[in-house]
């Protein structure tokens, strides 16, 4: 069973490792450089909320929510999701997504927007569309893959 709870200081190494594995994989995150634990701590501290997915006392995923834009755009949330590579296609991403939508509502956000969903990331595209996100645009070649191929990215939005 997957439990989703607030991120705790003891989770920092696990969340850093999750993030860095996805960066290294090179298929979905814009970041190219791994983060130190201190850099991840700083990143998490700058977010409005961070949660982790835990199974058998092991952190297997996480997400963090922040304002998509400052000031007059701060009523729209954005979030980043990390699911351990060995825990994909097991419902972890969906559980994190559903939890994040509920959390964003509680925090008073009016919508959720994702600015860079790689169009070839079929599980992610399927997840967001199944959760009633609408694709509001495409940026042709907006993601430079590790093989130097340029892939399209989609912008998704859902009212809360």
Segments from the language model and where they lie:
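A short beta-loop-alpha structural element at the N-terminal edge
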Residues: 2-15
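Hydrophobic adenine-recognition pocket in adenosine-nucleotide-binding enzymes
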Residues: 7, 83, 117
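Helix-loop element at the rim of GNAT/NAT acetyltransferase active sites that forms part
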Residues: 17-33
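Acetyl-CoA-dependent GNAT
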Residues: 28-86, 97-98, 103, 159-160
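Short hydrophobic/aromatic beta-strand or adjacent loop that forms the aromatic wall/cage
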Residues: 48, 151-155
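Conserved acetyl-CoA-binding loop-helix of GNAT-fold acetyltransferases
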Residues: 89-104, 126-130
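Conserved GNAT acetyl-CoA-binding A-motif
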Residues: 104-117
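Conserved catalytic-core motifs of GNAT/GCN5-like acyltransferases
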Residues: 115-117, 129-151
């Amino acid at each position: 069973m997957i439990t989703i709870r607030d991120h705790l200081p003891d989770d920092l190494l696990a969340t850093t490792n999750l993030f860095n594995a996805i960066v290294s994989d090179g298929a979905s995150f814009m970041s190219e450089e791994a983060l130190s634990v201190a850099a991840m701590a700083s990143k998490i501290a700058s977010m409005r909320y961070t949660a982790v997915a835990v199974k058998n006392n092991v952190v297997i995923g996480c997400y963090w929510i922040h304002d998509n834009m400052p000031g007059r755009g701060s009523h729209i949330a954005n979030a980043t999701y990390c699911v351990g590579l060995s825990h994909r296609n097991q419902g972890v991403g969906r559980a994190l997504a559903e939890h994040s939508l509920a959390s964003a509502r509680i925090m008073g956000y009016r919508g959720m927007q994702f600015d860079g969903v790689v169009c070839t990331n079929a599980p992610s595209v399927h997840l967001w569309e199944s959760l009633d996100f609408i694709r509001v645009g495409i940026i042709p070649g907006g993601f430079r893959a590790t093989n130097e191929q340029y892939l399209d990215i989609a912008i998704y939005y859902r009212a809360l």
